[in-house]
Amino acid sequence: MAASQLTQAPYTTAFALFEALWEAGITACFVNVGSDHPSVLEAIVKGKRERPNAWPRIITCPAEMTAISMADGYARVSGRPQAVLVHVDVGTQALGHGVHNASVGRVPVFIFAGMCPYTEAGEVTGSRTEYMHWLQEAPDQKAIVRQYCRYTGEVRTGLNVKQTVGRALQFANSAPRGPVYVAAAREVLAQEVPPYSLDQAQWVPVGPGALPPDAVAAIARALVQARRPLVVTGYSGRDRRCPGLLVALADLIPGMRVHDTGGSDVCFPFEHPASEGFRLALDECTRDTDMVFLLDCDVPWIPARNPPPEHATIYHVDCDPLNQQIPVSFFPAHGRWKADSFTALSQLVEYIRNDAALARQLQDPEYAARGAAREKVHASRLAEIAAQARLGDDEPLNAANIGSLLKTALPESTTFVIEAVTAAQTLSDQLQPSRPGSWINCGATGIGWSNGAALGVKMALMDLESDQPGEHSLVCQVVGDGSFMCAAPSSALWVASKYEVPVLTIVLNNGGWKAPRNSAQLVYPDGLAAGATDDEINISFCPTPNYAALAEAAAGSGAGRGGLADDDGAWMRGLRVRTVADLKRALEMVESRVIQQRKGMLLEVML
């Protein structure tokens, strides 16, 4: 039967759901559909045909982890949540560590799942029709993800589906931002309802909070009067305006240093002399301070390894200063305030600039000496980092020379999506990210995030560049083989190929997981595992998969060849490299293949 002869689909709860997403500013929906979605499928087709330019873009994702990670990556660039659609309890469970990542990483994502029909005998449209409808009914489906979500809800009637979506998005977009989850049964999704809309101006999130005047004065004076003030941050760079304000603060207070313990965003430019770089809460700078200012930071130090001196003054400003989702979190502070980072930094910079007493104090020659010493230390650190990269053509590859080569070979506009786990800190030292938004890390611990997140980041950048002809920014994913394997890489590679989302992927193949060995050595430095092989402690991936071949096969490009000759006919190109010379030659292809031709490329780096 021709499409024109088909009966026009009714306006249902499912259609109103997608309409609500679009009206709220959601432009993409990453889907993994199932038996709970007949009305959803009808709505998708109806929307595509009747209002193609005012309907979310529907992206098929063979694995749920791909779907939620793509939405996660998109939101980190755009600042706007996107939608994920999965089926019943099993699809919800398959979101797994992706929900953890969005929750811990403070990323807004709207998740929708169908529920099993609640009628058995065809009483209403959507009743049970298949065997699995008795097997997939969980006693409390929302409980699967409730402890990771800012809000969980259920659509019980189509008459208020848009209000339910609006309320969920208010939670997703209010600090601390994070995932929300809404579910609905088949019968409800099939319900016919009259069309309606909401005034979106009345469905806004909670606005940013500011510091009270006494807190501004206390923090500003403590920073200026301290001999070794230290700012420890983690998420503040998610707001791209914050790094510039932190620079202004560091320029006002010579000697102040800034340390990033989360690595999820560029919170402070590496090139600035105040930068202490990125470490996962373990750096000696926290021991060498008399005043610590914690700014949007979950884990500022490891209490058993590098706590600040007991005499240090500690102030904490955060959108969630009590870390309400972390039961054991005992970091002390002499003052805590719930406030927006950008607003708080603006207040502090303005106060210091306009306070006459502080201005006079900062004119003391001692401050100039502190600033000069800070610059000297930073220059020495940069020299030490540069010396770590051995770049002779025959040199084997490691995190230091890989990072150095990526920094010099790729455009300055490159956005790095990093999930290198044990190599991330070394990569940060070598890449030295300074442009806001140029470095994006998960900020959580659900490995495999970057496979989908890099695609979401690139999609968001492509949308931003759509009004700028000729602008084709590069996204470079750097991922360890353990993380790459952990989250259905074939699904992400297929999505990249189908929807032509070009990303340069660097897989660091060190033959397995290295982080568990590091963890064991911290607890049992002389234990049995310390002298055991990787196979004995079950962290080896040997014989190693051929990730270059996997990339080409998953993208439908044929078998991987592992050579260096380009194939313009294939959308995905996979290469294995072993030496500095190999990597240099491979990176020479990136400008033409990934940026200009907008095709995918995966480099498997043998460590």
Residue ranges and their predicted role:
Residues 2-353, 409, 474, 493, ...:
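N-terminal alpha/beta PP-like core and its mobile active-site loop of ThDP/TPP-dependent enzymes
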Residues 49, 173, 357, 415, ...:
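A generic secondary-structure boundary signal that marks alpha-helix termini
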Residues 234-239, 390-391, 480-482:
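Conserved short loop/turn motifs at secondary-structure junctions
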Residues 142, 246, 403, 547-548:
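Generic structural marker for isolated residues within well-ordered, non-membrane alpha-helices
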Residues 52, 123-136, 252, 286-288, ...:
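Thiamine diphosphate
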Residues 14-18, 22-25, 32-44, 243, ...:
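Active-site diphosphate/adenylate-binding microenvironment
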Residues 2-8, 159, 196, 217, ...:
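Phosphate/pyrophosphate-binding active-site segments
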Residues 11, 15, 34, 213, ...:
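Conserved structured core elements
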